[in-house]
């Protein structure tokens, strides 16, 4: 695992400036109100504009009919609503859609998963990933940069625009958001938290905090910070029943071991209402690596002090990976052991694997990792991950 990451970008300025238009997708509601105040307008104008932006997926000020023409003219001079564009779309036979979304000169991937009673969007937080988990395709691409707020919430906006805005169709285009796409969300708190605030805001997408899930591999100091910043559902990428295996497949474990990680999880649960007292454990099933019945018993003992439900994830292959997918029989035996201890255990249904949209398969378009250090020096201060 790389010991260094690029620092998150500084907060977006909210002072109107004709020389550099502000992308309103970069602003949460508090920042939007400050922006309108600095524009000489009443704060409620921010709520009006946000409603147009997120309820109607409107990016044209002239279409905001309850806003006077003078203000619309002002907004066109100093602001814009610019979501990242879809440059490629792939549709799976099971209804899953994967969009390649342009962020600058690179791409990230966003996945839309429709079901009978919900529609889930899997959102990326970084271009690439620094954590180098051995079973994940994204990690093999290396890390390039953090996404801005507008590039994170813009994925939700763009998907809602394509599927159909709530005020247009009469129903929510997206009911759940999972921060489980490309990147480690906790290494981009500066931008991930405001984006999630917009997802939850009634003038944003208005999602329940129980329907916005952040998944982390275990950046413990940032997880402790998260608990003081926002309350959303938490999923943890555990994937191993002991430190020996986790050190190998999830290298950040060498810095923050399982005991330290689970301690931070329990602290988050104490502060959270969204999780209703328990966390979701994600456990990818790797053939003869972490999927034996002895591993299941170890996992049950490990988690006995952590209220949780367990999602077993059949591993999704990618070229050059050194692993195999566990057989259905091994997954079934593993699941039965966990249930014998009283754990709620679910085997996740694989969706979108025929278009490389399943868990662990997102790759996007990341510049060759051999240039990582040079890129970091060019893009901003390089800091030690311990500082996060």
Curated annotation (Swiss-Prot):
Matching Gene3D superfamilies:
1.10.150.530, Aldolase class I
Enzyme nomenclature, EC number: 2.1.1.192
GO cellular-component terms in the record? cytoplasm
Give the superkingdom in one word. Bacteria
In which residues is [4Fe-4S] cluster bound? 129, 133, 136
InterPro entries according to UniProt: Aldolase_TIM, Methyltransferase_A, RlmN_N, RNA_MTrfase_RlmN, rRNA_lsu_MTrfase_RlmN/Cfr, rSAM
The free-text cofactor remark is: Binds 1 [4Fe-4S] cluster. The cluster is coordinated with 3 cysteines and an exchangeable S-adenosyl-L-methionine.
Q: Which cofactor does it need?
A: [4Fe-4S] cluster
Disulphide bonds annotated for this chain are 122-359
Q: Where is the active site?
A: 109 (proton acceptor), 359 (s-methylcysteine intermediate)
Q: Which Pfam families match?
A: Radical_SAM (PF04055), RlmN_N (PF21016)
Residues annotated as domain Radical SAM core: 115-354
Q: Give the keywords, sorted.
A: 4Fe-4S, Cytoplasm, Disulfide bond, Iron, Iron-sulfur, Metal-binding, Methyltransferase, rRNA processing, S-adenosyl-L-methionine, Transferase, tRNA processing
S-adenosyl-L-methionine: is it a keyword of this entry?
A: yes
Q: Which GO terms describe its molecular function?
A: 4 iron, 4 sulfur cluster binding; metal ion binding; rRNA (adenine(2503)-C2-)-methyltransferase activity; rRNA binding; tRNA (adenine(37)-C2)-methyltransferase activity; tRNA binding
Q: Which reaction does it catalyse?
A: adenosine(2503) in 23S rRNA + 2 reduced [2Fe-2S]-[ferredoxin] + 2 S-adenosyl-L-methionine = 2-methyladenosine(2503) in 23S rRNA + 5'-deoxyadenosine + L-methionine + 2 oxidized [2Fe-2S]-[ferredoxin] + S-adenosyl-L-homocysteine; adenosine(37) in tRNA + 2 reduced [2Fe-2S]-[ferredoxin] + 2 S-adenosyl-L-methionine = 2-methyladenosine(37) in tRNA + 5'-deoxyadenosine + L-methionine + 2 oxidized [2Fe-2S]-[ferredoxin] + S-adenosyl-L-homocysteine
The record lists S-adenosyl-L-methionine as bound by: 183-184, 215, 237-239, 316
* Principal location listed in the UniProt entry: cytoplasm
Family, similarity comment:
Belongs to the radical SAM superfamily. RlmN family.
Q: What does this protein do?
A: Specifically methylates position 2 of adenine 2503 in 23S rRNA and position 2 of adenine 37 in tRNAs. m2A2503 modification seems to play a crucial role in the proofreading step occurring at the peptidyl transferase center and thus would serve to optimize ribosomal fidelity.
Read off the NCBIfam families from this record.
PRK11194.1, rRNA_mod_RlmN
Supply any other comment. Answer: Reaction proceeds by a ping-pong mechanism involving intermediate methylation of a conserved cysteine residue.
Mind telling me what this protein is named?
Dual-specificity RNA methyltransferase RlmN
Organism, scientific name: Salmonella agona (strain SL483)
């Amino acid at each position: 695992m790389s010991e260094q990451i690029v620092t998150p970008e500084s907060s977006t300025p909210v002072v109107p400036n004709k020389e550099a238009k502000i992308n309103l997708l970069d602003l949460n509601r508090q920042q939007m109100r400050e922006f309108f105040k600095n524009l000489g307008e009443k704060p409620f104008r921010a709520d009006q504009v946000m409603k147009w932006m997120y309820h109607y997926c409107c990016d044209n000020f002239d279409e905001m009919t309850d806003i006077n023409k003078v203000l619309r003219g002002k907004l066109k001079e100093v602001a814009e609503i610019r979501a990242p564009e879809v440059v490629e779309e792939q549709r799976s036979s099971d209804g899953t859609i994967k969009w390649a979304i342009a962020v600058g000169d690179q791409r990230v991937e966003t996945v839309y998963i429709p079901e009978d009673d919900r529609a889930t969007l899997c959102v990326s937080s970084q271009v690439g990933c620094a954590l180098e988990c051995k079973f994940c395709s994204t990690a093999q691409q290396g890390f390039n940069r953090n996404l801005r707020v507008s590039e994170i919430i813009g994925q939700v906006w763009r998907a809602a625009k394509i599927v159909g805005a709530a005020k247009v169709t009469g129903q929510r285009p997206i009911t759940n958001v999972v921060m489980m796409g490309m990147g480690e969300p906790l290494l981009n708190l500066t931008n991930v938290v405001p984006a999630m605030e917009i997802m939850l805001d009634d003038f944003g997408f208005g999602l329940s905090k129980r329907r916005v899930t952040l998944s982390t591999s275990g950046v413990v100091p940032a997880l402790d910070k998260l608990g003081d910043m926002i309350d959303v559902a938490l999923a943890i990428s555990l994937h191993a029943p002991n430190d020996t295996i986790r050190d190998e497949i999830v290298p950040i474990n060498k810095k923050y071991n399982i005991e330290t990680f689970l301690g931070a999880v329990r602290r988050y649960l104490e502060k959270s209402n969204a999780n209703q007292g328990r966390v979701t454990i994600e456990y990818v099933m790797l053939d003869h690596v972490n999927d034996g019945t002895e591993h299941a018993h170890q996992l049950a003992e490990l988690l006995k002090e952590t209220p949780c439900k367990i999602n077993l994830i059949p591993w999704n292959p990618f070229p050059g990976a050194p692993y195999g997918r566990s057989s259905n029989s091994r997954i079934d035996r593993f699941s039965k052991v966990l249930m014998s201890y009283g754990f709620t255990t679910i085997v996740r249904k694989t969706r979108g694997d025929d278009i490389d949209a399943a868990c662990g398969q997102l790759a996007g378009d990341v510049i060759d990792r051999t240039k990582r250090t040079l890129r970091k020096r060019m893009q901003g201060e390089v800091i030690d991950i311990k500082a996060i």
